[in-house]
UniProtKB/Swiss-Prot annotation:
It is an enzyme of class 3 (hydrolase). GO terms for biological process: galactose catabolic process; polysaccharide catabolic process. Its EC number is 3.2.1.23. Its main location: secreted. The gene is lacB. InterPro entries: Betagal_dom2, Betagal_dom2_sf, BetaGal_dom3, BetaGal_dom3_sf, BetaGal_jelly_roll_dom, Galactose-bd-like_sf, Gly_Hdrlase_35_cat, Glycoside_Hdrlase_35. Residues 1-21 form the signal peptide. It is found in: Secreted. The active site is at E196 (proton donor), E308 (nucleophile). This is Probable beta-galactosidase B. Belongs to the glycosyl hydrolase 35 family. It comes from the Eukaryota. Cleaves beta-linked terminal galactosyl residues from gangliosides, glycoproteins, and glycosaminoglycans. Substrate binds at Y90, N135, A136, E137, N195, Y265, Y373.
Amino acid sequence: MATAFWLLLFLLGSLHVLTAAQNSSQSEWPIHDNGLSKVVQWDHYSFYINGQRIFLFSGEFHYWRIPVPALWRDILEKIKAIGFTGFAFYSSWAYHAPNNQTVDFSTGARDITPIYDLAKELGMYIIVRPGPYVNAEASAGGFPLWLTTGAYGSTRNDDPRYTAAWEPYFAEVSEITSKYQVTDGHYTLCYQIENEYGQQWIGDPRDRNPNQTAIAYMELLQASARENGITVPLTGNDPNMNTKSWGSDWSDAGGNLDTVGLDSYPSCWSCDVSVCTGTNGEYVPYKVLDYYDYFQEVQPTMPFFMPEFQGGSYNPWDGPEGGCTEDTGADFANLFYRWNIGQRVSAMSLYMMFGGTNWGGIAAPVTASSYDYSAPISEDRSIGSKYYETKLLALFTRCAKDLTMTDRLGNGTQYTDNEAVIASELRNPDTNAAFYVTTHLDTTVGTDESFKLHVNTSKGALTIPRHGGTIRLNGHHSKIIVTDFNFGSETLLYSTAEVLTYAVFDRKPTLVLWVPTGESGEFAIKGAKSGSVAKCSGCSNIKFHRDSGSLTVAFTQGEGISVLQLDNGVRVVLLDRQKAYTFWAPALTDNPLVPEGESVLVSGPYLVRTARLARSTLTLRGDSKGETLEIFAPRKIKKVTWNGKAVEATRTSYGSLKAILAKPPSVELPTLNGWKYSDSLPERFPTYDDSGAAWVEIDANHMTTPNPNKPATLPVLYADEYGFHNGVRLWRGYFNSSASGVYLNIQGGAAFGWSAWLNGHFLGSHLGSASIQQANGTLDFPANTLNTEGTPNVLLVVHDDTGHDQTTGVLNPRGILEARLLSEASDNNDDDSPGFTHWRVAGTAGGESDLDPVRGVYNEDGLYAERVGWHLPGFDDSKWATVNGTSLSFTGATVRFFRTVIPPLSIPENTDVSISFVFSTPNVNNTSAGNTSAFRAQLFVNGYQYGRYNPYVGNQVVYPVPPGILDYNGENTIGVAVWAQTEAGARLNLDWRVNYVLGSSLDAGRLDLSFVAIAYVYIFECLQL
């Protein structure tokens, strides 16, 4: 009676829902193109490529955050292996334009053509996002820092000065991309103009009052893209649901793009969730947002497209070591990505898929060195539960062709017999295949709920499961229940177990289903009459029920893999979650959509990167820890190779091939010892000669600035106006008077710091705070620190910056806003109060001239050690003092540079080895009088600055450094610059560790590192004092 009652209730509710859906939909949605080609088209449902609908599942990576081109293959193969059909990347204007006369897309890791070539080889569509502004938690949002002086206007508008600045870069990246478009047989799918530029309207977008300046800017960008060969759709991304910009469905105002999408970070883009309340409201873990109504209102004739959906969160300076992985982990991936499918999203790109590292000075002040982003692929390139959980959905969306065209017929609790569980019904109007996306009614609770689901099928209305048991949602999870799911020539009438994937071998399909470990499932396959258990590993309670025209199978699956064989030739593989995590479907083709007969199924390894089939030989590449390999593939296969070596494979009774992979060897790292050191702050002494090429004279002629943020005192002491744009800068101010002190107000961004010395005597510091961007202080001049009359006094101010601000803050200056000598006259506002006679400033050696084009101008800053090349391989430190022991410690407020050279590492062949450096502060004295953690350290590895360690301000202690920066076959030069901000000095240790060792086709010890050859050359002749 209960079942009949619920079924009747469901049928009555469905009648209303279906009628409402039909009344609000169109029988024919327009198919759009951009008028240049019909290769890429789109409509209300999805994108088309060459007439075939696609579900675009993509993930973002930034090549400039992993400046080792040989490792781009590693990241992109992992993105492909997860089941994605595409990837996205920002191009960084800053990375390619060290000055306003240079656009470099050819040197080292600045050559982006390997990315396009890899996309073609691996079979993935690309969303190219060239800016000019990209945000990305990059310094100045990816703008080159020479743009931040104010001389180019306020930016992101149609100011001719700004236009002249971006046009050479934008033309170059467009021209390069134009050779790799899907319209010409390559895989660039679309080209995003600007980023999160929701400025089309003045005021409320519903008033549709056009912002003509923003419209003119967008039209200039579009014209440039087209003039330089871009023929694929031009796209945009709204930053949130409030801006409603650039879509022709919303308005026919100027500047509209071909297609637009919506960015969303429902759990906050930062580990500091307070920064998101203005967009998302109060943070509640696992609270989902409604997108369906937004898309229906704003872009009903376009695909529901999310160019950025939350793949993790960046970690601010005061965030936890390792980031906030628990906030956006495997459960987040399970729930939120399925929720989006229930919202009818058919194109989604995760930001980030791989974050990488903010090496050098590329970060904005909001984050430290790590850009791990809690992404599915970690900063150290490892994969874990979040990656595997995402794969469970991605492989499904790749094989579920009917998901590319669905109407949402309803959503609510009427679909279930448990009022705590809701479902959204998506149905393909052409095939009648349906997808029921089930979640908790309140997604924030995560309770253990069991339920039955009311569905409509080609066999009529059913309540499933039909033969006992229930469907279960245990925790912050979602399940997609399919009906009339087509696989090969067969039809899955329904399944309460989720579909992972399927493949067709020898004209017979193999269907792969999974459930959480220990849960039950039930599925029905049309046309089958009987079945048998070919393998039972963890299975129980398997029962076959013959129904009218179909066979229903009920089962429970514990940890393991079970295989069923049906009489119609269908093979069904049953997996629990853990086995599903390491079950792969590598493509045999470079077609991103992977036709059903163009893949094999592989179980066991940590990662399966690629598969190729030639005659009777199956060639697999991947990473392993010594697992058992099981392959479901065509019967013609007689030989299997793994990473180029034949493996002894035996055939099972149910048709698979099994082999045991070798365990990788262990790797031990040598001790980091043999340290030497030298003082790196000679500039604090009045006898230092600052007349060299490294120093720029600042005199009374520099009394104005184009920056709208004016200084309080003159001359202008904004570092960017003198060509020094990142990291540490040194200012030497000269005066002749008998001042009693100095007032300084300095701006360097969140977490920055400064210190000051008078004639070699330490005066004081701003130690820094994650929340303070600008800091002032009054410093008294102690007795006997001033020189006698006739000898000038020298005030040295050392400050760093943590990057330039983003969005509207890109013009916020970096440098000294106010420098005022104090005396009795100044206290009385006397015109004869003392002043500085002149200043000199030093920063990155060569300024904008890019002396080291491989590492680039963002790698070094202005410390003496960097200006003269102590951090580079090849420097002769034989006359330096030797550190006793392994602690890099000293007393006194100064900068000391430590350096050691480590003999070649013993990295075995055919492995991938990941290594991190780990800082610690032993026996730290945190009293105000003797704080030995009040220092700022920079880690250099073979000349690359690969970590900023500020223990007084931030919490990051682990710094992954990839192969290619670390030389796995030669010596490694390790340097640490330590700036002690108190007289107590600094105490720190540096160690390193192996994150993992895998048997791997990557062969990390033998990468092609030809791109770094110039970077390892000793370049003293270019460096400056």
